Amino acid sequence: EKCGVPEWTIKALARDFAEKTTSILHYMGGSMFRGPYSHEPARLECILLAMQGLGGPGVHQAQISYTGMPRAKGLGSTRFFNPSLSQRLTKPVQTTIRAWGKQLIPKTMIHDAILNPPLEFWGNGGIEERVEDQFVKYEYPLPKDKGGTDIRMMWTDTPCRITCWNYGNETIVAERNPQIEFILAQHPWLENDCLYADMILPANTLLEVDDIVTNTRQGIQHHTINLQTKAIEPVGESKSDYEVVLEIAKKLGKGEEFSEGKSIRDLQQEVFHNMELENFISWDDFEKNQYVVLPTAEDWEDDVVGLRPFYEDPENNPIPTPSGKLEFYSERIDKHYPDDLERPPIPKWVEKSAMHDERLSSFRSNAYPLLLMSNHGRWRMQSQCDDITWCREIVTCKVKAWDGYLYEPCWIHPQDAESRDIKDGDIVQVFNER
C-alpha cells in the first residue's frame, strides 16, 4: 500500500533478517539517509540490531571503509589524533562551524540568513558535533553587544554552494542581494558561485601543489601516507589555497602569525614528525619514495570489537545514552521534543508533515505522481569530475541531445517511461509546481 512492495516480500525479508546473524554496514549512508525523515530508518536499524543482540558476534553497525580497517602501528587508533595539532587540525575539522567565530550559520541556511533574518534554529549542523548540540537553540544574528552582525562579505574557497547543496536558486538570489557588498572566490575554474563573485583568485589544481596526505578512505586496506609532489608548475599566476590565504594575511599584517615562518617543506616535515613516521622510514627515504605504508599492528586482533564490552557487561560498559542502555524510546527526544511529529521518541513510519508531503497519498501526487530521488551522480562526486570530457563520453554519464548539449541522465522505471512514451535517449523535463 505504501511502497509498492508486496506484503509477503516484506515479511520474508523480516524473517530472513531475524533468523540470521546480521550486521548492517554503511559507507556514508547514500540516498537512504538523504531525504525527508531519513532519521527514522537510521534509528530503526538500531532497534533491529538491538533485537539481534548488538555487540554480539556478527551483530554490529559499522562503516565499511577506513574506520573498520585493522589498527596500524604508530597511530594508536583508527582515528589520527595528536594533541599538539589539536587546534590546527582536530578542532577545525570536527566543529568548523563554531571553531572560532562568535556567530554561526549552518551552511544549509546561508540563503535564509541573508534573505530572511532573523533566524532561530536547533543545533549548529557541525560535522561530528556532540549529540547534545541538537537540543541547543541558536539565533542569527546575535545581539550587537554579543558580537552579532549581518553578512556583508562572502569568501569561498569551495564555490559550489549552488550545485552541491540545497536551495540553489535561492542561493543565487542571496548572492546577488544588495546587502552583500563583496564576494571573493578562489578556484581553478569559473564554476557556480564564481559567476557571482566580485573577485576571483586563481587557485591551483591538485596537480600543481606540494603537500603531504593520508590515503585511508579510497577503498585500500592499509594506512598510507603520501608525499605529494606537484606534477606541473602552477598555471599562470595561480597559487595553492594555502598561498592565497597567506598572501591575504600578509596584506592584513598577519602573514608571519599565519605561517609561523614555515615553508611548505617545513610544514610537510612537521606533519611527518608529528605522526612519528620516522619510526618507519627516514625523511630522506620518504622524500625519495614519496610514500610509506604503515604496517598493521601485530596485536590488532586483540582490539575491542565494536560494542562487545556492552554486550558482555552492559552495567559496567554503558553506551552514551541517558540510561546507558539501548533505548527503543528516546529519553532525549521525549524530554526536549515530545510532540515532534517528524521525529517522535520511538521511530516509526511518518506519512507526512507540514514540511514534507511527498507520498502517493498526498493531494500533490494527483498532479505529480513520480517521486524524484536525487542520488549522487554515477560518474562523479557531487560536481567534482563533471568537467572531465572522458567521463562525458560514457553513455550513462550524459545524454547528448539534438542541440549538442550534454544533459544530465534521468533514470525512469520502464513502466513509467512506457506510459509516457519516453524512450532511451529522449530529453525530458522534470518539474513540479515549485
Predicted segments with their positions:
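A cross-kingdom feature strongest in bacterial/archaeal respiratory oxidoreductases
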Residues: G74, R98-P234, E270-R434
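A glycine-rich, hydrophobic/aromatic-adjacent loop/helix-cap motif
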Residues: W8, L13, F17-Y140, E327
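Non-catalytic, well-ordered alpha-helical segments in soluble enzyme domains
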Residues: D241-F258
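Flexible glycine/proline-enriched surface loops and loop-helix/loop-strand junctions
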Residues: E1, H26-M32, T224-E233
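Short, hydrophobic/amphipathic alpha-helical patches that form generic packing surfaces
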Residues: L44-M51, L246-K251, N375
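Intrinsically disordered or highly flexible coil/loop and linker segments, enriched in small
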Residues: V5, E19-H26, L54-Q61, C160-T163, ...
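Alpha-amylase-like alpha-glycosidases and glucanotransferases acting on alpha-linked glucans and related
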Residues: T229-S238, Y242-L246
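A glycine-rich phosphate-binding loop feature that marks nucleotide/adenosyl-phosphate handling sites
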Residues: D16, Q61-A72, G261-E276, H376
